Amino acid sequence: MGAKTPWIQLQKLLNWWVRDQDWNQHVDQLHMLQQKSIWESPLLRAAKENDMCTLKKLQHDQNCDFRQRGALGETALHVAALYDNLDAAIMLMEAAPYLVTESTLCEPFVGQTALHIAVMNQNVNLVRALLARGASASARATGSAFHRSSHNLIYYGEHPLSFAACVGSEEIVRLLIEHGADIRAQDSLGNTVLHILVLQPNKTFACQMYNLLLSYDGGDHLKSLELVPNNQGLTPFKLAGVEGNTVMFQHLMQKRKRIQWSFGPLTSSLYDLTEIDSWGEELSFLELVVSSKKKEARQILEQTPVKELVSLKWKKYGQPYFCLLGALYIFYMVCFTTCCVYRPLKFRDANRTHVRDNTIMEQKSLQEAYVTYQDKIRLVGELVTVIGAVIILLLEIPDIFRVGASRYFGQTVLGGPFHVIIITYASLVLLTMAMRLTNVNGEVVPMSMALVLGWCSVMYFARGFQMLGPFTIMIQKMIFGDLLRFCWLMAMVILGFASAFYIIFQTEDPDNLGEFSDYPTAMFSTFELFLTIIDGPANYRVDLPFMYSVTYATFAIIATLLMLNLFIAMMGDTHWRVAQERDELWRAQVVATTVMLERKMPRFLWPRSGICGCEYGLGDRWFLRVEHHQEQNPYRVLRYVEAFKSSDKEEVQEQLSEKQPSGTETGTLARGSVVLQTPPLSRTTSLSSNSHRGWEILRRNTLGHLNLGLDPGEGDGEEIYQF
């Protein structure tokens, strides 16, 4: 029985993998079976085709079972609702009222009622009929088709209300709420209808429905619907930040903004920092945004007031503390390096036992290591090093459990690789200390590795500077992206050609060609050849095997000409991609660093930013005042442009009238008319003059920019928001 267990587990794993791979095929088969069952059943087919005559006959047929279901566990009422057959649905409800509350029984549509289908199809009349006959407005569909998954093209939640809100039917939303639909209902992920609206691609309808649903959120509950979190602890506002939904974020910020005053082009506004400010919050909005897997989330950092809040925190507290921390770390590494350079060594007592043995000094024992005055000074540095390593671990380990190992080490913006490096460094320092205390030889191994890792961690502090911050991200992406892929290819090539070289020289005298005398040496020599560190290690004073020339020529072409240049091209492409996002990435680094410092620093060294509303009668909330400089209204500029155009027409007409024949003027004078020359409103300069030509270019450029920038729906302000 025990021998069969591994095979059973393997079979389950294979079945799960095959089922996951063939999900689409499985769904296709279900739908084909559904159509087949509908065609074979007279009741289901009549419901599909809206055949009232057949339905009336079946209604009076004693053998007809209105509870019969199709391949997916759907009833005839489900079929009628699916094909928008109102008459058939009403007849079925009259013949079998219990069908109104029946739900689908089979995956992937478990729990789906006819009301769900009618709402999705926006059949208002059918929705009214179902609600009038007792359909539950809070019915829940729990099948896999209603989950947020890569297999599903849409995610509308599990309740009819969320369906109606996502399809944008305001009338159905009002109907459902009037018939008792719970606007606070949550699906299996804990998402309310507001969460689900944030996830919709049609952001205009989502914002409109968001406002409509909030208007029904009464004061019966202590917590607003907007503050209800899902299973991940995300409110709709935080979810908008994680998803990078800038439209919804701006919409919600407009609801929180309070305009203080306007003075010409200047406007002063107060922004509510609830859920935005990371001060004192366990699940920080800023940290969620920078750690999001979606690139669109970084655009949230450009929005007001997030941009201003981060800039305030970074310039006032973050940058000075970060620079101070970097200086302390460099001093710490200098101390550690000095202790390693002057580590306790003594001359070796034993004689050499092998001709290749080149060791002349060895490590002192613990009793001999701390005797002289210089040893005691070194001991102080070693204590500083060990205490620093312990502090590093105490600061890093709690964050691993708080954030999660995969996210903490995997997010580049959060400094993931540097966390691995610094934790490994601290562990190696403690290992070196343990080896020193126990008189175990070989401390040079962890000590040398710790030196390399410790100094590499200095690059982490480059993120405090705009010029160097993206540079570190570029190095990380090249190492963990391009270099890892290249190393796999390089390993395969080296393994193959090293084996070939070893076989070719297996019958030759190793004294004349020792680079391939044994297999490990052949592997290392091939690695050096691959990186062009050495030339072809051949002794041309003796006859070489013919296959060596062929193999070496092939290796040189593949390794040097092809693969190394391919690697350079890959790194160039990575450099170009990172360069396109350098400012965005650096800003995300600054936000992540600011949040990290704010969480670590004592409260008396990092006070809360913003304005407390309690002091000004604004409640127990914090605000940030932002002044906006409004751009000139393009419509006002357009008036001046039109004035320029009209003045030009007057000039042209005037010059044309001056060029008319003199007979016209004499005829006019003969009639006794007196023509008075009035000065034009604009400057009367020649069209061919340089000044007028420059004025013309300036005016046309202004017109061109206005034509590109004008929009009939735009207003005067800097921040324009409309639906």
From Swiss-Prot:
Task: Classify the protein's membrane topology as the record does.
Answer: Multi-pass membrane protein
Q: Which ranges sit in the Cytoplasmic compartment?
A: 1-320, 436-441, 571-723
* Consequence of gene disruption: Mutant mice appear grossly normal and are fertile. They display polyuria and increased urinary excretion of Ca(2+), due to defective Ca(2+) reabsorption in the kidney distal convoluted tubules. Likewise, they display increased urinary excretion of phosphate. Besides, their urine has a lower pH. The polyuria and the urine acidification may be a response to the high urinary Ca(2+) levels, preventing the formation of kidney stones. Serum Ca(2+) and phosphate levels are normal, probably due to increased expression of TRPV6 and increased Ca(2+) absorption in the intestine.
Activity regulation remarks: Activated by WNK3.
Residue spans of biased composition, Polar residues class: 654-667
The residues that cross the membrane are 321-341, 379-401, 413-435, 442-462, 486-506, 550-570
Residue ranges in the Extracellular topological domain are: 342-378, 402-412, 463-485
- Major site of localization recorded for this protein: membrane
Q: In which tissues is it expressed?
A: Detected in kidney cortex (at protein level).
| Reactions catalysed | Ca(2+)(in) = Ca(2+)(out)
Q: InterPro entries from the xrefs?
A: Ankyrin_rpt, Ankyrin_rpt-contain_sf, Ion_trans_dom, TRPV, TRPV5, TRPV5/TRPV6
Q: What domain of life does the UniProt record list for this protein's source?
A: Eukaryota
Gene3D superfamilies documented for this protein: 1.10.287.70, Ankyrin repeat-containing domain
Arranged from A to Z, the UniProt key words for this protein are:
ANK repeat, Calcium, Calcium channel, Calcium transport, Calmodulin-binding, Cell membrane, Ion channel, Ion transport, Membrane, Metal-binding, Phosphoprotein, Repeat, Transmembrane, Transmembrane helix, Transport
* Intramembrane portions: 517-537
Enumerate the subcellular locations listed in this protein's record, separating them with semicolons: Apical cell membrane
- Interaction with S100A10: region residues: 591-595
What does this gene product do? Answer: Constitutively active calcium selective cation channel thought to be involved in Ca(2+) reabsorption in kidney and intestine. Required for normal Ca(2+) reabsorption in the kidney distal convoluted tubules. The channel is activated by low internal calcium level and the current exhibits an inward rectification. A Ca(2+)-dependent feedback regulation includes fast channel inactivation and slow current decay. Heteromeric assembly with TRPV6 seems to modify channel properties. TRPV5-TRPV6 heteromultimeric concatemers exhibit voltage-dependent gating.
Which family, according to the similarity comment?
Belongs to the transient receptor (TC 1.A.4) family. TrpV subfamily. TRPV5 sub-subfamily.
Record-linked NCBIfam families: trp
Indicate what this protein is called per its UniProt record. Answer: Transient receptor potential cation channel subfamily V member 5
Q: Which organism is it from?
A: Mus musculus (Mouse)
- From the UniProt record, report the name of the gene that encodes this protein: Trpv5
